[in-house]
Amino acid sequence: MVQKQYRASPVILVMVLLCTASSFAEAQAESSDETVAHGKALVEAADCGSCHTADPAKPFAGGKRIDTPFGAIYSPNLTPDRETGIGAWRDEDFHRALRYGVRRDGSRYYPAFPYPNFTKMVRDDLLAIRAYLATLTPFSNEAPPPALHWPLNYRVVMRVWNWLFFKPGILVPDQQKSTEWNRGRYLVEGAAHCGACHTPKNLFGADKKNRPLGGGLVQGWFAPRLDGAERSGLKSWSADDIVEYLQSGRNGHSNADGLMAEVVANSTSKMSDADVRAIAVYLKDFPPGAAEPAVTPPPPTEMTAGAAVYAHACVSCHETDGSGAPRIYPPLPGNANLQSADPSSALRIILDGAQTLTTPRAPNTGSMPAYAGKFSDQEIADVTNYIRNSWGNAAPPVTASQVAKARKRQ
């Protein structure tokens, strides 16, 4: 039997190839769009914009001054400008920066850039971030060089720091925990880098490994404990309370102020419901951590003096019993931030005043005037001690000298 051989028509072959190429291009475009959207969500979770935007008209163009205990650094340009941004970077350059804290020229970043957290993220997520940043409007903006104290002004010193305190590696899921819990951990310890502010640091600016999420001082604000501590942690907050706070900037316990207000506005209020819920689930499972310090109440004379200042300046909004107007003027009894061992945030708010953050979920607002020019250091100390030790609250005493130091940070 003779077998007939068939030869495909050139026209048909071209049509098949064109259709295949078209389908592949469409699939690739869809994948690219999906990757960019995923990267955008991660950039928002990481709150990149807060540190890398100095001029709101030039988002992500860097140049923002960030003060640290070791001097000042300036955030770099993340836009795709080829000369001053990351437009000329390869994927491997970007991956190496976030995974290992290594700059394109081979020198080391300073850990104010939270690569100790980003190292825990999977490669695909890191490159999704790059994919999104590549879609931004490029701006030419060269950040100033760091202004750090000797010897940290030499980046080579960071090799020693990394050897002592940095362990690169992707976070391994805990198979004994739920998918939601593991997602929350990935965000808290990785992308959202909560510990960069909420974990106390040692003398070299590295996390104290024995006190994760135990509260930390950042640019004159105290980022409170996120562990299960009874007075100054999240023990009294439910998962729903945490979700409401992260999405709106307020709940029945507290309002977001200072740097945390930026985080809510630029990051957590934009995250998906599922991711915010995952963070809440993880944090509610976090152990109490270090014991809270025993507190000796202030002398009755100081409490009486503080009560007089409170009656004069605070009672009209916060009420005699401290109940306030929840979600506008936060309640003072049981307020974890107010009872933190470090009073820095309370002093900043009393001295500088506060404006309630508005978000799509909480558009109404309230304000608190600044009292720096109205009361003496001792009067500020008295009223701070009063609200930190009334209505069942308990916190270490604040002195007039602490208030004086807080004034200098204004």
What feature does the model see in each segment?
Residues M1-T35, I73-P76, A97, V102-D105, ...:
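Post-cleavage N-terminal segment of exported redox proteins
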Residues D33-A54, P59-D67, V160-N162, V172-N202, ...:
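Sequence/structural segment immediately N-terminal to covalent heme-attachment motifs in c-type
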